[in-house]
Amino acid sequence: KGMALLDIGCGWGYLLIEAAKKYGVKGVGITLSAEQCAEFRHRIQAEGLEDSLKAELMDYRDLPKSGYTFDRVVSVGMLEHVGRPNYQLFVDCVNDVLKDGGIFLLHFISALKEHPGDPWIKKYIFPGGMVPSLREMLCCLSEDNFHTLDVENLRLHYHKTLLCWAKNFHKHLEDERKMFDERFLRMWNLYLNACAA
């Protein structure tokens, strides 16, 4: 209760809202998306959590000069957007704002070994994205003296997640057609189903 929690790549803010409601954390979420930041701020207000949570439009590289310090740091599904040349910088920035004895939870999609990634996904789905290997992330973390306490492989869970996303995608296809062209919709459908396979 009362711990300071940072969510790097907080998206729409659900993780922090639940943590504030269930565990009484004081949290900050950072994102590069102005739309997500605005919606997260709206949700903070709607939940009456203005004294507990803050949404910031901020790059993780600006954390060291932010003046913030945290007991806990989480990052869920954002590392893939950092890029291999910046993995160590990312870990360094976390280290700069994490209090001594703090805990860092890093959730990411990983590969068995380092590779450049799927060319189609890199071109059409996640330009600039990169899937790190567990080995290279453990090396980066050890450079800042992080001690790995647990590693969990969620591969089978993610298969189910992708199938749910694909089902939801098809359920709302008519609404999506108002926002995206058929080419994009076919690509997104292929991406979800190919990754689930």
Task: Set out the residue ranges of the language-model regions.
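Conserved SAM-binding loop of SAM-dependent methyltransferases across substrates and taxa
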Residues: 12-23
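Conserved SAM-binding strand-loop segment of SAM-dependent methyltransferases
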Residues: 48-60
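A short glycine-rich, Lys/Arg-flanked "PGG" loop and its adjoining helix->strand segment in the class I
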Residues: 88-100
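Conserved SAM-binding loop
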Residues: 40-41
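Substrate-binding/catalytic lobe of Class I Rossmann-like enzymes that use SAM or dcSAM, i.e.
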Residues: 109-197
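Conserved beta-strand signature within the Rossmann-like core of class I S-adenosyl-L-methionine
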Residues: 101-109
